């Protein structure tokens, strides 16, 4: 018997393959199929029926293991409440597929690609499987190039690689969300690109806050959704481990379409990459695998690699990924963050001390790193300027204890000059954001890399020693700082 499984997320005419549930253990279920009709690994299975209370059940599962005796073990993507042994299981004959393309912008999806924002169905022309191989070597773009963000502190001291992976470290309330939204805004304006945000295993409240803030800052255009700059995919803390393990792949699949078909530069945000590993660990235990170091899954490196290797630049476009990294108990040697670090090209560390001083973005200029900051990649001028800025800030950090105990007057003339320049640099690293205009009232600034380098060179050379340090706070390029100083002198 043939049946059109369009309603089950598969758009081909396939022979109906029906099994039944033999065992349910939490989010894991075993199903038996007729001899010779075994589903493939990663095939999507659908359980439909009624629970004892008469309510409709529709649970999607993914095949993880072939057990023998015509049985498979699958992991559920939603709650298994109400499922009973003997219920029918339909093999869709293909992996889970999700809607892709322009119709996804401005919308929120779950792991199955179903909209969860109450704005009606998605009118997508195409669906793509979430399990795709990484691009072949011949498709990759191996040229090292910087991905300009328009944010001074990032572009100068820890530049992002086009098609690279960046780790974003920072506690609560130091400005992660605002930095993410500014990057989404800037890639749309400067690169004509789009962004995909994957909320993996984080708080539902945070996901809702981010959505609300994106609407307020016009990153999501409520009046005309197609003009939005981002698609959101959420699999939050309350979801079963199967959903949290696969939601990163759903977000990545949407991003790959923009890169490969629309030939765009895409920003992919994953918040939080640790929760992806954590979900994989839960699934691994449920499937009966022997745990590895610190209780993690034995397949940790393979799972991380299969996700990270798909995030890359091709000759058509690029996916640059920014991943929030939670470090359990601040232990950097924990297998989850340690495996993540192997894939990162740059780290952006947000500092609570800078946020307390009111310096935003609160990116720590000494702790943030990038493999791109090499003279043969960024050029001698950029490299020398960045090193000069770091040395000045490092010296200021060393002198802070002396200043706190004895005061500025006890320093040598040279050290006092270093401190004055370091304070100007610290303030010049701050910048007004476009997405914060609604809250601050000051217009946002996009600063090109050339302007950034020029500004810091002028501070380091001593050309601007006569200007007050307040003139450098929350401005764009150096011309704005000199103009601000001129206005304040006229007022005095």
Swiss-Prot record:
It comes from the Eukaryota. Its EC number is 7.1.2.2. F-type ATPases have 2 components, CF(1) - the catalytic core - and CF(0) - the membrane proton channel. CF(1) has five subunits: alpha(3), beta(3), gamma(1), delta(1), epsilon(1). CF(0) has four main subunits: a(1), b(1), b'(1) and c(9-12). Produces ATP from ADP in the presence of a proton gradient across the membrane. The catalytic sites are hosted primarily by the beta subunits. One of its GO terms (biological process) is proton motive force-driven mitochondrial ATP synthesis. GO terms for cellular component: chloroplast thylakoid membrane; mitochondrion; proton-transporting ATP synthase complex. It catalyses: ATP + H2O + 4 H(+)(in) = ADP + phosphate + 5 H(+)(out). It is found in: Plastid, Chloroplast thylakoid membrane. GO terms for molecular function: ATP binding; ATP hydrolysis activity; proton-transporting ATP synthase activity, rotational mechanism. SUPFAM superfamilies: C-terminal domain of alpha and beta subunits of F1 ATP synthase, N-terminal domain of alpha and beta subunits of F1 ATP synthase, P-loop containing nucleoside triphosphate hydrolases. Keywords: ATP synthesis, ATP-binding, CF(1), Chloroplast, Hydrogen ion transport, Ion transport, Membrane, Nucleotide-binding, Plastid, Thylakoid, Translocase, Transport. ATP binds at residues 170-177. CDD domains: ATP-synt_F1_beta_C, ATP-synt_F1_beta_N, F1-ATPase_beta_CD. Pfam families: ATP-synt_ab, ATP-synt_ab_N, ATP-synt_VA_C. Belongs to the ATPase alpha/beta chains family. This is ATP synthase subunit beta, chloroplastic. It comes from Psilotum nudum. It is a peripheral membrane protein. InterPro entries: AAA+_ATPase, ATP-synt_VA_C, ATP_synth_F1_bsu, ATPase_a/bsu_AS, ATPase_alpha/beta_chains, ATPase_F1/V1/A1_a/bsu_N, ATPase_F1/V1/A1_a/bsu_N_sf, ATPase_F1/V1/A1_a/bsu_nucl-bd.
């Amino acid at each position: 018997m043939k049946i059109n499984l369009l309603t089950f997320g598969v758009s081909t005419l396939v022979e109906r393959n029906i099994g039944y549930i033999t065992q349910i253990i939490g989010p894991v279920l075993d199903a038996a199929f007729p001899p010779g009709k075994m589903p493939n690994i990663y095939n999507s299975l659908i359980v439909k029926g009624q629970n004892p209370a008469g309510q409709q059940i529709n649970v999607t599962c993914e095949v993880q293991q072939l057990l023998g005796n015509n049985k498979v073990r699958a992991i559920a993507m939603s709650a298994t409440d109400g499922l009973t042994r003997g219920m029918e299981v339909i093999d869709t004959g293909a992996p889970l597929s999700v809607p892709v393309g322009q119709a996804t912008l401005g919308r929120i999806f779950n792991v199955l690609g179903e909209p969860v924002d109450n704005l009606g169905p998605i009118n997508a022309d195409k669906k793509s499987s979430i399990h795709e191989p990484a691009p072949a070597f011949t498709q990759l773009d191996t040229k090292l190039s910087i991905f300009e963000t328009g944010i001074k502190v990032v572009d100068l001291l820890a530049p992002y690689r086009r098609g690279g992976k960046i780790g974003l470290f920072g506690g609560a309330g130091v400005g992660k969300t605002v930095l993410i939204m500014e990057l989404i805004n800037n890639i749309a304006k400067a690169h004509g690109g789009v962004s995909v945000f994957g909320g993996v295993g984080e708080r539902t409240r945070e996901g809702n806050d981010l959505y609300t803030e994106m609407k307020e800052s016009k990153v999501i255009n409520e009046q005309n959704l197609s003009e939005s700059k981002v698609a959101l995919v959420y699999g939050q803390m309350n979801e079963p481990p199967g959903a949290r393990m696969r939601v990163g792949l759903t977000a990545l699949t949407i991003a790959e379409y923009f890169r490969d078909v629309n030939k765009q530069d895409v920003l992919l945000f994953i918040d939080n990459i640790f929760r992806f590993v954590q979900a994989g660990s839960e699934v691994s235990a449920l499937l009966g695998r022997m745990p590895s170091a610190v209780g993690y899954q034995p397949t940790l490196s393979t799972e991380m690699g299969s996700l990270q290797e798909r995030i890359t630049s091709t000759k058509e476009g690029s996916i640059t990924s920014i991943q929030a990294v939670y470090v359990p108990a601040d232990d950097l040697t924990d297998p989850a963050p340690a495996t993540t670090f192997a894939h990162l090209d740059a780290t952006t560390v947000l500092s609570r001390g800078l946020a307390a001083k009111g310096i935003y973005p609160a990116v720590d200029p000494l702790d943030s790193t990038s493999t791109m900051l090499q003279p043969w990649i960024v050029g001698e001028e950029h490299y020398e300027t960045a090193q000069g800025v770091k040395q000045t800030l490092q010296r200021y950090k060393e002198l802070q204890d002396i200043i706190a105990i004895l005061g500025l007057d006890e320093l040598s003339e040279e050290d006092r000059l270093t401190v004055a320049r370091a304070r100007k640099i610290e303030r010049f690293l701050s910048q007004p954001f476009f997405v914060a205009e609604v809250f601050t009232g000051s217009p946002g600034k996009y600063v090109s890399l050339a302007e950034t380098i020029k500004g810091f060179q002028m501070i380091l050379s001593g050309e601007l020693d006569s200007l007050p340090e307040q003139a450098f706070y929350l401005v764009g390029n150096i011309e704005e700082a000199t103009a601000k100083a001129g206005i304040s002198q006229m007022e005095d």
